[in-house]
Amino acid sequence: MADDLRAGGVLEPIAMVPPRPDLAAEKEPASWKEGLFLDADPCSDQGYHANPGATVKTLIPEGKTPFPRIIQTNELLFYERFRAYQDYILADCKASEVKEFTVSFLEKVLEPSGWWAVWHTNVFEVLVEVTNVDFPSLKAVVRLAEPCIYESKLSTFTLANVKELLDLKEFHLPLQELWVVSDDSHEFHQMALAIEHVRFFYKHIWRSWDEEEEDEYDYFVRCVEPRLRLYYDILEDRVPSGLIVDYHNLLSQCEESYRKFLNLRSSLSNCNSDSEQENISMVEGLNLYSEIEQLKQKLKLIENPLLRYVFGYQKNSNIQGKGTRQNGQKVIHVVSSTMKTGLLRSLFKDRFCEESCKEETEIKFHSDLLSGINACYDGDTVIICPGHYVVHGTCSIADSIELEGYGLPDDIVIEKRGKGDTFVDCTGMDVKISGIKFIQHDSVEGILIIHHGKTTLENCVLQCETTGVTVRTSAELFMKNSDVYGAKGAGIEIYPGSKCTLTDNGIHHCKEGILIKDFLDEHYDIPKISMINNVIHNNEGYGVVLVKPTIFCDLQENTQDEINDNMVQKNKEADVTEGLDLEEMLQCVASKMEPYATADFNEQAKGNCEIINELLAISMQKGRMKKRLSELGITQADDNIMSQEMFIEIMGNQFKWNGKGSFGTFLY
């Protein structure tokens, strides 16, 4: 009934959750009501709430059966739940103490008897009277109210069935299934809000395996806060829809595997024999445990907002390209909101005069941009005439086509409006985009995502809102003479196994300039990056950020010592060769940078050198790893991996006025 009850109702005065008396005495000399009515919360995010104060409403449910007014509590804001769990319910408890703290909180708030509630299930609703509360089990002892008010969604499920069900449950109902009925005095609003916090916690926050997690630091910081933030991020369309589906699937898989693990562990504990079947069960249990741990790590990756941003969401694009036409013909698509004679004459003069000397080419005209792109086959060209084009869906480019703006980028503007995950999706083998300005609004993911193949971006302007250009694994980006700005994430995200060439671009006023996701994952190669004559400036964080594991940093600590050892220990030919290679690389790079360096070693040269030093550290780390593997007899399969370099060419880049500097690392 709760869903139906939220459809409408009569507003009533607000009520607040009382704090735990012991915490109130320690933290706030004022009354708990004064504390909860404060207008600001230092722990809350700016975008999570609009109005202060935890409020509850009452409503008269709409339906055939005249149920009494219930207290509505499902519309609480992020910071209201945050404060309740942090300050009044869980505080700094451990996972093993969650039940104890919850019971203690409810004992201070709930009346043990004398209140009514609507027992809500997926099948029926019935009015009950609470005669007692069994706090340790989080259940209420109830009886059917007099007069009995009952409504069922199934005609076959009668009031007699409800009475039978109550008998089976021994009249003990979970508090989460009860919706408190209001009276004119509003004295039960606090109880309703307390039950709502418990209901929400066990539905959206608590996991059955939490008690078996590490219990050394407080549960709120480790689990409650990230899961609560994820819930509201999803609610406010901050998370890609595909990632939401993945998260719920992972959660279901983990719950199912954990259930199997508990059953298996229970059967083993009841078995005293050392039989072959028991040994098989133990192996199965170890496999289940390993699977559960992997699933839990994936869940934590999504729940943590920072890691969710750093690692991103690798969506699998299911869009299939059409390929070439059966007759092999290529078509030129002209997109213009209005076609006038002057524009048509200029277009034919500038664009089609050379084509007239060749074989005949078909030309199609479109007033809608997406229809023009969707009509393309391999080898087609889309010419976009000056104008402001508004799209409400995703521009999916699955074939090798060319998207060409006829004029200056500021004259050909494509603006994304309406909520959605992505703006431009590229999966074609060879996509070319030039002379266009893209403006992003309300998207969850980047303004341009390259999933597969090569995309060339030239003379374009990208006004971002979330992330700029994302280059996924196995994809390739060649970007030249383009401008990327305004991203709340990184201007450019480069994934492992991708290739990225950046020449003469501006990347500015983003959270980070370029984010390189070098996970050192065994399944991926490192990205290959060339950066030439780019201007990376006025970004909130670093100009370039490299993501790498902590173990990577540990291996780097003795890099300089390793170089010195290689130069001294000349009797070891392999070490001498490795040292010379690195020395030659440093000299080569230094010679390339010489024209850009000044007496005071300006910021431009410093930024390039910081990236080059990272290159040398990566090379040395690989050399050390190769040497260790060689000592173990592993040489053949590793040669190709160890010979790769992340930065192919770094020169002439300018780093100016970036908040944290030119180059930084994110360790995980």
UniProtKB/Swiss-Prot annotation:
The modification Phosphoserine is found at residues 31, 44, 273, 630. It is found in: Midbody; Cytoplasm, Cytoskeleton, Spindle. Keywords: Acetylation, Cytoplasm, Cytoskeleton, Phosphoprotein, Repeat. SUPFAM superfamilies: Pectin lyase-like. GO terms for biological process: fibroblast growth factor receptor signaling pathway; regulation of neural precursor cell proliferation. It comes from the Eukaryota. One of its GO terms (molecular function) is SH2 domain binding. Expressed in spleen, lung and heart with higher expression in testis. No expression in brain, liver and skeletal muscle. Elevated expression in actively cycling cells. PbH1 repeats lie at residues 428-451, 452-473, 474-496, 497-518, 526-548. Signal peptide: none annotated. InterPro entries: Beta_helix, PbH1, Pectin_lyas_fold, Pectin_lyase_fold/virulence, SHCBP1-like. Interacts directly with isoform p52shc of SHC1 via its SH2 domain. Interacts with TRIM71; leading to enhanced SHCBP1 protein stability. Interacts with both members of the centralspindlin complex, KIF23 and RACGAP1. This is SHC SH2 domain-binding protein 1. The lineage of its organism: Eukaryota, Metazoa, Chordata, Craniata, Vertebrata.
